[in-house]
Regions:
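Short acidic, glycine/serine/threonine-rich loops at helix termini
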Residues: 1, 38-43, 50-52, 64, ...
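Single conserved hydrophobic/aromatic residue that forms the stacking wall/gate
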Residues: 1-13
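Conserved phosphate-binding/catalytic loops in two-lobed NTP-binding clefts
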Residues: 11, 157-178
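Gly/Thr-rich phosphate-binding beta-strand-loop-beta motif of the actin/hexokinase/Hsp70
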Residues: 25-46
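Glycine-rich phosphate-binding loops at beta-strand->alpha-helix junctions
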Residues: 132-133, 137-160, 172-173
Length: 191
């Protein structure tokens, strides 16, 4: 019951899930539907630093969903589109609403969709850069949340952060559940 009542521990569980999955990971960028978090952990999985951006939807899963709609394609198709870009068209708007308007204008002008998509990925990667640096990411980082499955974003983060994005062997959306199960196991819970 205590485990079920422990609301607000999702980030703790994600951190624990990542640590159980790959103890070498020292930095996490968690990109969910509504916020972006940077989490630095030490060798035993203890949180050293935490940073969060929940003030703007730009840079979140919801933002990617609206961009995919603007491109009239699935989220999976959009996530991979930027990988074929030869150039990047920068997205200058910092607000999700203005960014969507900017993207629609660029599409209307006939700009290459893959280059616009690369600009969107780069824009989000820059927001992730801020969270990762605030949290203290240095050598490598892993991604959790649904956006961790976005290959274009992973490549953009590697480019912006100039560090390796470590792929986890387990679904990155399951890190919270895995961490909660590990927490229950450590506490001797029969959950």
């Amino acid at each position: 019951r205590d485990l079920v009542r422990s609301r607000g521990l999702g980030d703790v569980y994600k951190r624990q899930g990542v640590h159980v999955t790959d103890p070498s990971v020292k930095a996490i960028i968690d990109i969910g539907g509504q916020d972006v978090k940077g989490i630095a952990i030490d060798t035993d999985g203890t949180v050293l630093n935490f940073a969060m951006n929940d003030k703007c939807a730009a840079g979140t899963g919801r933002f990617f969903e609206s961009m995919a709609r603007a491109f009239e394609m699935s989220l999976d198709e959009f996530s991979n589109l930027s990988l074929t870009a030869k150039n990047v068209i920068p997205i200058t708007a910092q607000c999700a609403v203005f960014a969507e308007s900017e993207v629609i204008s660029l599409v209307g002008e006939g700009k290459p969709m893959e280059e616009i998509a690369a600009g969107i990925q780069l824009s989000v990667a820059k927001r992730c850069f801020v969270m990762a640096k605030k949290a203290g990411a240095a050598d490598s980082v892993t991604l959790t949340g649904g956006c961790a499955k976005n290959e274009g974003l992973k490549k953009a983060i590697e480019k912006v952060l100039k560090i390796n994005v470590v792929d986890l062997p387990t679904d990155p959306q399951l890190m919270g559940a895995l961490g909660a199960a590990e927490y229950a196991r450590q506490k001797g819970s029969n959950v």
